[in-house]
Design a protein with these regions (language model features):
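A generic, well-ordered mixed alpha/beta core segment in the N-terminal half of proteins
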Residues: 80-150
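Midchain, well-structured core segments that form catalytic/ion-binding scaffolds
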Residues: 119-120, 124-285
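His/Asp/Glu-rich mid-to-C-terminal helical/loop segments that flank catalytic regions of hydrolases
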Residues: 220, 224-249, 296, 366-401
């Protein structure tokens, strides 16, 4: 077994959910299920015991040694127009690392698991990281009632897969875990610009996501004076700029990712505007005040137009730090391979941020060509994928060998 196997597996997995030049493998879709079935066969072919837990997480277990397991993982669900590396490198790279240790004849002192967590992306049902939330024992009951654009609920899809929504709490397994490592593409330009081969993650930013509704008044686009309008889109514009200024001032990011306008006609002033908001920040102190900041900023921005504001917070995950000991182990593994490395934060959310508060956790990044992700143009060079597997395997061997 060689590290190059991960690139072969990435190409195979990309065939599930092919959509033109992109990958569309939404959580709980048929393409997602077919991909998990293929992955289960890969796990079993590598000598792992594969099983789908009550939350839809697929886990391959190398039942060796004793004590708590070291878990390597990420996700294989995707957004609507995705590339082939986001999440999948962490799962297939984890499998490749296990196969490297097996080929070397390593006999682990602890069990090793490879996990593909359910619905990390959250794009279909509007809430992310269901699988890792259930895995660590969070109450995910509210998630089950969420519906996609076609009106299908998570609970309905679970039943279609042969899973019982009432048993989702049985997916909790964190008490059996001693450490977690996640290999991932950077999804940004820092490593490539710096000419570095790997990034050792020091922490993951906190994230608040919300759905915002602004209500004004529909009226004639030609006969209503500008100073007599309650235009919901004008409120959106003011709010977007104000949120951007607040994010820049705090070293964070604010993104309005989707917008819906009613009634949506050339000749009618918009009566309603709904939009999604994603606000991220690295400081815990700043994060703790983020909900109030969003409320205050949006409401103040909409006052000049006399708009009614409704804000529903859909997700809130605080920033987390990575485990210093495993971070150092990853650095040593990179150094043994002669790889250039740098410490860096993660601006993206990952399953690791749910697991880090419970067990020692670390993440390893490899470069993203052009810093592009969540796009068919997403690309990580094959040699960087292979190097990531080698560094991961080196750290894993140090932890369990």
């Amino acid at each position: 077994m060689t590290p190059s196997a991960v690139n072969d597996d990435l190409a195979r997995l990309a065939q599930f959910g092919t959509h033109g030049d992109a990958v569309r493998r939404l959580a709980w879709s048929d393409a997602h299920r077919d991909a998990l079935d293929w992955l289960a066969s890969r796990f079993e072919g590598a000598g792992l015991e594969a099983s789908l837990d009550p939350a839809g997480n697929l886990i391959g277990r190398w039942q060796a040694g004793s004590g708590k397991a070291v878990v390597l993982g990420s996700h294989i669900d995707s957004g609507p127009e995705a590339g082939r590396y986001d999440g999948t490198l962490g799962v297939l790279g984890g499998l490749a690392a296990v196969e490297l240790l097996k080929a070397k004849g390593v006999e682990p002192r602890h069990p090793v698991w490879v996990a593909s967590f359910m619905d990390e992306e959250g794009v279909r049902f509007g809430a992310s990281m269901l699988g890792s939330r259930a895995f660590v024992g969070q109450d995910v009951g509210e998630y089950l009632a969420r519906r996609d654009a076609d009106g299908v609920s998570v609970a309905e899809e679970m039943r279609r897969w042969g899973l019982d929504p009432e048993r989702i709490g049985a997916a909790e397994a964190i008490d059996d875990v001693g450490a977690y490592l996640e290999l991932h593409i950077e999804q940004g330009p820092v490593l490539e610009r710096a000419g570095e081969e790997v990034g050792i993650v020091t922490g993951i930013v906190g994230m608040v996501q919300a759905q915002v509704r602004l209500d004004g008044e529909a009226n004639h686009a030609g006969t209503t004076p500008m100073d007599a309008r309650r235009d919901a889109v004008t409120g959106l514009a003011r709010a977007a700029l104000a949120l951007r200024e607040e994010a820049v001032a705090r070293g964070g990011t604010a993104t309005i990712g989707s917008v819906a306008v009613e009634p949506g006609a050339f000749t009618v002033i918009p009566a309603r505007c709904e939009f999604s908001l994603d606000f991220r920040i690295g400081s815990r102190a700043e994060f703790d005040g983020l909900r109030e900041l969003i409320e205050t900023t949006v409401r103040r921005a909409c006052e000049p137009d006399g708009l009614e504001v409704e804000i529903e917070l859909t997700d809130a995950d605080p920033p987390v730090e990575m485990d210093a000991a495993i971070v150092a182990e990853l650095e040593r593994a990179a150094a043994r391979l002669g790889a250039t490395a740098r410490r860096m934060p993660s601006g993206a959310g990952h399953d690791a941020m749910l697991i880090a508060p419970h067990v020692p956790t670390a993440m390893l990044f490899v470069p993203s060509r052009g810093g592009i992700s969540h796009s068919p143009l997403e690309l990580t060079d094959p040699e960087h994928c292979e190097l990531g597997v080698q560094v991961l395997a080196g750290a894993l061997e140090a932890l369990v060998g």
